[in-house]
């Protein structure tokens, strides 16, 4: 059977929540603290499961980024990834490199905004060796090696208006819980054809882990 590997991002491939890290990077610590203080009551209700996770997340996101051009937002996302390689778990990177040759497909399935998840995948998780993007790249090309299997990103997408600015809303459902399974099935609909290995670390990954043939909870922590 064709093997598919699907990974949660925050807390599974990374050491930390990248939403908080990205807001701090993009807006600075003072503005970040002021914004979260404003929404503290809402976040408490969310933790108590009295307010939907996706609504709280969308309100916080809108507070910081509504009205920003998509071009500016994407530039910040790329810069954030370039400065945040340390957030990735070394064991996760090593595992991805190890299983890539046997994989039919690999995906990061994340509630985080895909605009900042994708640069992490492109910069750090696409080559078969951490050095391939530099000194070994020309050697690989000269030997006509088959390109390494890319990791696709299935994340939460932002809504953009006609002027190319972020509305503060999400264009897709928050990629959390059951939505993770729906997003996987939208790309690979014939479940019986695949052997799925899933990796996650939180309640938001429960359905994805249950969907998989092999499920790994809180991996890569060694």
Model-derived features with residue positions:
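C-terminal cap/substrate-recognition subdomain and adjoining C-terminal extension
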Residues: 4, 75-76, 82-130, 144-222
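Conserved alpha/beta cores of soluble small-molecule-handling proteins
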Residues: 30-32, 52, 71, 90-94, ...
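Short histidine/acidic/glycine/proline-rich micro-motifs that form metal-
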Residues: 47, 81-82
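Helix-loop "lid/cap" segments that line or gate small-molecule binding pockets
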Residues: 44-49, 56-65
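Active-site neighborhood of HAD-like aspartate-dependent phosphohydrolases
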Residues: 1-49
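Acidic catalytic patch
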Residues: 66-74
């Amino acid at each position: 059977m064709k093997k598919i590997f699907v990974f949660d991002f925050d807390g599974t491939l990374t050491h930390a929540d990248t939403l908080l890290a990205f807001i701090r990077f993009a807006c600075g610590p003072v503005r970040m603290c002021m914004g979260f203080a404003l929404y503290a009551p809402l976040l408490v209700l969310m933790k108590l499961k009295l307010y939907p996770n996706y609504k709280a997340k969308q309100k916080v996101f809108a507070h910081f980024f509504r009205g920003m051009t998509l071009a500016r937002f994407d530039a910040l996302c790329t810069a954030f990834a370039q400065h945040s390689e340390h957030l990735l778990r070394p064991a996760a990177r090593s595992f991805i490199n190890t299983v890539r040759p046997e994989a039919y497909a690999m995906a990061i399935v994340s509630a985080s905004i895909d605009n900042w998840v994708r640069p992490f995948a492109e910069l750090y998780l696409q080559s078969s060796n951490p050095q391939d993007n530099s000194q070994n790249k020309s050697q690989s090309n000269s030997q006509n090696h088959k390109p390494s299997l890319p990791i696709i990103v299935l994340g939460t997408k932002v809504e953009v208006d006609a002027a190319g600015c972020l509305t503060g809303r999400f264009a897709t459902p928050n990629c959390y819980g059951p939505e993770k399974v729906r997003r996987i099935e939208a790309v690979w609909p014939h479940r019986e054809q695949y052997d799925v290995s899933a990796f996650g670390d939180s309640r938001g990954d429960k359905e994805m882990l249950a969907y998989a043939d092999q499920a790994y909870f809180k991996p890569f922590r060694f």
